[in-house]
């Protein structure tokens, strides 16, 4: 028996003929992003405590879906990180300063969390998301220039990631729709 199974086998495994191409693509993407820094300016609070409380809450997935449809890059951060932000009066984690923190709707907001959100709000805009207002939240964030790319039109199935490396912008776009898409976007400094 072959234990563990060898998927790659130097690209010669007949069960996985395209595996060599997949690995080559992954290596290319990793090489391009190696040493880069993502420019993430939006954080979404993951409220595990709200999920455990038995009270009503909005899933982080709903907020994430709206942000993804609008090409707004974000980090999901745990509640604990608000208590240890690197800078008083704003949300800064791992050298990344967030312009906006989104708090998904929850029925109960603990006093400790409420105080932390108040402290963070001095330098980071804190927005409370509701299911009925997700589309307007996405539009608001786009209007603030927080999308990774400035598309000329709506492309809800395109996912975008922007990073900087060596003073240059790097973009990764991924189409999650089964059909091809032709997109146009504005890039600073280009006409």
Regions found by a protein language model. Give the residues of each.
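Carbohydrate-binding surfaces of carbohydrate-active enzymes
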Residues: 1-191
């Amino acid at each position: 028996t072959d234990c563990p199974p060898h998927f790659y086998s130097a690209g010669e495994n007949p069960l996985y003929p395209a595996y060599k191409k997949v690995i080559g693509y992954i290596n290319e993407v990793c090489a391009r992003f190696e040493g880069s820094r993502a420019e993430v300016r939006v954080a979404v609070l993951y409220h595990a405590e709200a999920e455990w409380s038995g009270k009503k809450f909005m899933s982080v997935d709903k907020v994430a879906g709206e942000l993804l449809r609008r090409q707004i890059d974000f980090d999901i951060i745990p509640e604990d990180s608000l208590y240890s932000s690197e800078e008083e009066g704003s949300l800064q984690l791992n050298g990344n300063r967030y312009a906006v923190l989104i708090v998904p709707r929850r029925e109960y907001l603990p006093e400790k969390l409420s105080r932390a959100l108040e402290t963070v709000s001095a330098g980071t805009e804190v927005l409370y998301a509701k299911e009925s207002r997700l589309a307007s939240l996405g539009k608001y964030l786009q209007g603030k220039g927080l999308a990774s790319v400035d598309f000329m039109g709506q492309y809800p199935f395109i996912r975008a990631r922007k990073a900087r490396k060596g003073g240059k912008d790097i973009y990764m776009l991924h189409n999650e729709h089964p059909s091809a898409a032709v997109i146009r976007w504005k890039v600073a400094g280009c006409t």
